[in-house]
């Protein structure tokens, strides 16, 4: 209960919580009860689906081979969403509760948007994305200063009577500041945690493919030139603002169209992105060869079901996300599979406690079929659990418990039931493989991913669709590791958690190009239809030319989703921030610094 032990609570590390006051405590103290209630409701819908199913099997699965994400949240809460903002223009946020007016100018738009973001976040477990935010902001900028406002950012918009003079550009920056700092504030409806917020950015061809048929309520259409100027200004502004304050949100994703040769269709945007990376900016780049999917979160890629515009409610392809996430503990599953053999102990190295198969064993069809069938049997239960959770959510929706869905911000049937993967590296290591660019590891990865994707397609219904992702698993990766270690399973000794990447993040012998290949279509990208972010950790920033080479290489090999991580450093005395590590503050000389 002490206020200084926030880090020991069950709070997301990315939630901007620094101390635990009574508001945080009130949310945390009920999590055990929430989990029990959530489990009881979930189990009741499983029994409705299959009255003969032994519910003890589900309970055991969730204690061993499966991990239900955020199970201590409220009953029936969706996991994450990418919401349409169109109902925002038609009905304001009154349908979500409270009183408000329809935004009529840029000032009211930015103010009510913050309320919208907090209201949407209060109904879900995880992230809320508003991919259209900057396009809508541009709409109100044009209503304020004309369609060519972006050509005259230095024009003064205040009179001589004003003490502080403002230009179009400085006023826009002020609205950037208002929105950005607001979404980084704590939210009472989320246990005093910030709403996990995501913004999307688009190149010219992705923008036209996504919003080509879009029409605002007044009959006007989005403008690429002004929106492009605005989104670039915001991304550049955010990079500079992060030198003043460590801003967690928004998580930014830039969507670009490429061809199969690895060429970016919008070269101007390509050069801009690489220049921003070279200046130390931090965001994800999403590469696609068609406008058939959208990345709206730090972890998810979701197929766009129908990219046509509905003038009645504004529905368009950006509405997506996950309803629920259940992650497979692959390391334990693979060891359990081997334990089904009567002579499995004969294949265990007594020194390492790892499997001692010949290095080429994975290429044998009988082994592949054995793993495939074992995973399929587990997946049958996973789909039962996911169907049941989907039934629970539809029950909640039928009883009008989801204000955001009733108001048209999101469509329940367009979201996914996600099957996560964790412990991939460790499963491969247990079987004697090296997690690098080799034929055996590639065969293993494709076997796992293709098996799940094949079953996802088989189990799709009109109201339930599935995808697969290599989950970040911030807390799950530690919990699964500790659980397996305590139960006597083999776990690695060089780390105390299960990796979230296809490569081993602590492997210093694997090159950056091989890391990209491991997240390419050759290994996984085509099978992981729910996404797998390739986090490329660098010790220092690269040049624009170097980033251009790497992004072209990603596009060529089919690495769809990546970002570059270089540690920022902050002085704990004067709060000077730099986009590279330092041991001594260059401003005040203090050695009390934090990465």
Task: Spell out what each predicted region is.
Residues 135, 417-430, 450:
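Contiguous, well-ordered alpha-helical segments that form the cores/surfaces of helical PPI scaffolds
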């Amino acid at each position: 209960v002490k206020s200084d032990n926030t880090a020991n609570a069950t709070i997301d590390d990315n939630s901007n919580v620094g101390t635990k006051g009574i508001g945080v405590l009130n949310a945390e103290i009920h999590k055990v009860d929430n989990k029990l209630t959530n489990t009881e409701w979930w189990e009741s819908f499983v029994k409705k689906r299959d009255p003969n199913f032994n519910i003890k099997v589900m309970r055991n699965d969730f204690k061993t081979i499966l991990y239900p994400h955020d199970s201590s949240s409220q009953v029936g809460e969706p996991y994450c969403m990418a919401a349409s903002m169109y109902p925002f223009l038609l009905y304001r946020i009154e349908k979500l509760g409270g009183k408000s007016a329809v935004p009529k100018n840029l000032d009211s738009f930015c103010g009510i948007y913050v309320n919208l973001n907090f209201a949407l976040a209060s109904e879900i477990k995880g992230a809320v994305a508003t991919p259209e935010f900057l396009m809508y902001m541009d709409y109100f900028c044009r209503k304020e200063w004309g369609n060519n406002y972006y050509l005259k950012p230095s024009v003064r918009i205040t009179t001589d009577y004003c003490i502080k003079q403002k230009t179009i550009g400085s006023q826009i920056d002020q609205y950037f500041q208002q929105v950005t700092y607001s979404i980084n504030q704590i939210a009472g409806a989320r246990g005093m945690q910030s709403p996990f917020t995501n913004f999307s950015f688009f190149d010219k061809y992705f923008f036209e493919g996504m919003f080509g048929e879009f029409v605002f309520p007044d009959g006007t259409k989005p403008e690429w030139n002004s929106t492009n100027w605005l989104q670039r200004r915001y991304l550049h502004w955010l990079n500079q603002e992060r030198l003043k304050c460590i801003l967690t949100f928004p998580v930014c994703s830039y969507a670009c169209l490429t061809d199969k040769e690895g060429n970016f269709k919008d070269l101007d945007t390509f050069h801009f992105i690489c220049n921003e990376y070279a200046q130390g900016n931090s965001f994800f780049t999403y590469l696609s060869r068609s406008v058939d999917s959208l990345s709206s979160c730090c972890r998810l890629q979701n197929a766009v079901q129908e990219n046509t515009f509905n003038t009645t409610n504004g529905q368009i392809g950006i509405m997506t996300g996950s309803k629920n996430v259940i992650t497979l503990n692959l390391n334990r599953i693979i060891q359990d599979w081997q334990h089904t053999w009567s002579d499995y102990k004969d294949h265990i190295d007594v020194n390492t406690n790892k499997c001692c198969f010949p290095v080429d064993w994975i290429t044998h069809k009988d082994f592949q079929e054995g793993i495939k069938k074992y995973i399929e049997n587990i997946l049958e239960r996973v789909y039962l659990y996911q169907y049941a959770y989907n039934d629970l959510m539809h029950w909640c929706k039928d009883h009008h418990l989801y204000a955001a869905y009733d108001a048209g911000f999101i469509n329940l049937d367009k979201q996914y039931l996600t099957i996560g993967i964790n412990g991939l590296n460790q499963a491969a290591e247990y079987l004697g493989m090296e997690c690098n660019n080799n034929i055996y590891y590639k065969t293993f990865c494709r076997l796992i991913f293709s098996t799940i994707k094949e079953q996802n397609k088989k189990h799709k219904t009109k109201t339930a669709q599935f995808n697969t992702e290599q989950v970040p698993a911030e807390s799950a990766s530690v919990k699964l590791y500790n659980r397996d270690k305590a139960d006597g399973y083999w776990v690695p000794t060089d780390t105390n958690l299960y990796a979230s990447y296809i490569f081993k993040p602590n492997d210093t012998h694997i090159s950056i190009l091989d890391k990209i290949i491991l997240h390419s279509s050759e290994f996984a990208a085509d099978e992981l239809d729910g996404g797998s972010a390739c986090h490329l950790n660098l010790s220092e920033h690269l040049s624009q030319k170097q980033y251009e080479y790497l992004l072209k290489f990603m596009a060529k090999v089919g690495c769809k989703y990546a970002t570059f991580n270089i540690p920022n450093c902050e002085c704990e005395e004067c709060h000077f921030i730099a986009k590279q590590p330092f041991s001594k503050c260059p401003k005040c000389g203090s050695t009390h610094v934090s990465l």
